[in-house]
C-alpha cells in the first residue's frame, strides 16, 4: 500500500514538473517558426520587388547566416556589422525604417547567432578573420545584387573590424557608417567604471557602488571578472547601455530574443551560446588595441553617429578619434536622446541623415566642427 502511494506521489510530482515544461516548450515552438515575414502592399499581398529572407552563404569555409530585408531589392545594399550580440531581434520592438532606404543585410558573423557552430575552431575567431569575412561577403553581395559598391555600417564591436575593412578595400564601398565607433576601448571602460560608480554613489545605491569599488578597471587586459559580471547590469540600470529605456538584460534582451519569430528555437539557443563562445575571444583584442593608431585614414566618406548617453563605447573618445581621422568627406552626428543604439532610439533622425548626407556623400547635417 505504501509503495503504491509513493508511486502515485512520484507520478504526480513528475506531472507537476513536466506539464509546465511541455507547455513552455510548446509556446516557444509556436513563436519560433523561423521564417521572416514578407513586406505587404496595401492589399495585404507580398510587396512586388521586395525581399525578406533568411540566407546562408559559405564564407571562407564557414557557413554563415544573415537576414536580408528591403522594400525594394533595387535599393542600395547596406551590410550591417553587429556588436557582441546579433540584434536583428530588437527590430520587433524598435522599427528602424532602414529597409525603406536600403536592402539591409543583417549579417550574424562567424561564431554568432545564425553563424554559430559548436565545432568551429576557436582560433579562427579573430578580428583579422572577421575583416576577411566582411570583404568576402561584400563581394558576394555586390555580385548577387549587381552593385559595384555597397554601404558598410558597423555598430559597437562591429566597428572594430568594420573600419579596418573599409580602410583595406575602399573601392568596394560608397561610405563607412559607424554607430558607436570603438577607438580605445580600455580607456572607454575606465571612463564607464568611473561614471557608473559616481552615479550609484549619488543615488545612494551602496550595494552596486561597493561591487564596482571591488572591481576596479586598470591598465591591464583581461578586465576583472567581477567587473564584467556587474558591467552590463549597471549600464542597463543607469540607461547608458543598449538603449536609454532598457533597464534589464534579462527582460529586454533575453526574453525579447525568445519571442523573435524569425528564429527557430534552435537558432535562439545558438544566439546565446554564440555570445558565450565569441565574446571573450574578440573582447580582449579590442581592449588591447588602440584603433586611433591602427586606422588613421579612410579614402571614402565616413559618418560617425553616436548617442551622447553611451557609456558602452565612449562618446567623447569616438569624437576625439573622428577629429583626427582623415577622410575626403566626414561627419559626426550627436544623438542627444540616445545611448548605444541611435537607429533604435532616434530612427527618424537616423533616416534623415542617411537620406540627406550618406546617400549623397555630403555632410550638411553633421555637427558643427
Model-derived features with residue positions:
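Glycine-rich "HGGG/HGxG" loop immediately N-terminal to the catalytic nucleophile
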Residues: 88-89, 111-125
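Conserved alpha/beta-hydrolase
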Residues: 98-117
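Conserved acidic catalytic loop of the alpha/beta-hydrolase fold
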Residues: 129-149
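A catalytic-pocket lid/entrance helix-loop region that shapes and gates access to the active site
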Residues: 168-219
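Alpha/beta-hydrolase
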Residues: 206-293, 300
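Short beta-strand/loop motif that positions the catalytic acidic residue
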Residues: 298, 304-306, 310
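Conserved alpha/beta-hydrolase "acid-adjacent" motif
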Residues: 311-317
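Catalytic histidine-centered segment of alpha/beta-hydrolase-like enzymes
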Residues: 338-347, 351
Amino acid at each position: 500500500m505504501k509503495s503504491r502511494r509513493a508511486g502515485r506521489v512520484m507520478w504526480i510530482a513528475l506531472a507537476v514538473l513536466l506539464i509546465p515544461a511541455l507547455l513552455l516548450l510548446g509556446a516557444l515552438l509556436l513563436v519560433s517558426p523561423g521564417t521572416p515575414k514578407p513586406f505587404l502592399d496595401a492589399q495585404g499581398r507580398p510587396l512586388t520587388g521586395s525581399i525578406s529572407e533568411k540566407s546562408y552563404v559559405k564564407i571562407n569555409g564557414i557557413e554563415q547566416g544573415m537576414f536580408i530585408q528591403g522594400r525594394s531589392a533595387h535599393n542600395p545594399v547596406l551590410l550591417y556589422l553587429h556588436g557582441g550580440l546579433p540584434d536583428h531581434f530588437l527590430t520587433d520592438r524598435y522599427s528602424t525604417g532602414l529597409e525603406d532606404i536600403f536592402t539591409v543585410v543583417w549579417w550574424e558573423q562567424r561564431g554568432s547567432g545564425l553563424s554559430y557552430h559548436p565545432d568551429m575552431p576557436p582560433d579562427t575567431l579573430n578580428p583579422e578573420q572577421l575583416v576577411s569575412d566582411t570583404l568576402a561577403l561584400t563581394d558576394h553581395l555586390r555580385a548577387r545584387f549587381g552593385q559595384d559598391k555597397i554601404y558598410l555600417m558597423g555598430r559597437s564591436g562591429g566597428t572594430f573590424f568594420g573600419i579596418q575593412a573599409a580602410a583595406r578595400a575602399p573601392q568596394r564601398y560608397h561610405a563607412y557608417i559607424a554607430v558607436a565607433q570603438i577607438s580605445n576601448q580600455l580607456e572607454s571602460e575606465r571612463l564607464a567604471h568611473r561614471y557608473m560608480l559616481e552615479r550609484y554613489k549619488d543615488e545612494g545605491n551602496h550595494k552596486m557602488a561597493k561591487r564596482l569599488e571591488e572591481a576596479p578597471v586598470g591598465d591591464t587586459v583581461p578586465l576583472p571578472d567581477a567587473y564584467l559580471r556587474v558591467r552590463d547590469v549597471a549600464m542597463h540600470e543607469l540607461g547608458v547601455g543598449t538603449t536609454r529605456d532598457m533597464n534589464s538584460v534579462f527582460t529586454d534582451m533575453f526574453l525579447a530574443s525568445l519571442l523573435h519569430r524569425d528564429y527557430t528555437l534552435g537558432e535562439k539557443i545558438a544566439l546565446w551560446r554564440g555570445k558565450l563562445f565569441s565574446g571573450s575571444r574578440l573582447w580582449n583584442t579590442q581592449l588591447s588595441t588602440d584603433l586611433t593608431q591602427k586606422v588613421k585614414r579612410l579614402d571614402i566618406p565616413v559618418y560617425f553617429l553616436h548617442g551622447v548617453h553611451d557609456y558602452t563605447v565612449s562618446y567623447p573618445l569616438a569624437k576625439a578619434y573622428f577629429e583626427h581621422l582623415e577622410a575626403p568627406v566626414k561627419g559626426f552626428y550627436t544623438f542627444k536622446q540616445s545611448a548605444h543604439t541611435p537607429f533604435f532610439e532616434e530612427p527618424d533622425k537616423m533616416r534623415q541623415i542617411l537620406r540627406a548626407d550618406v546617400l549623397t556623400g555630403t555632410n550638411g547635417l553633421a555637427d558643427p566642427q
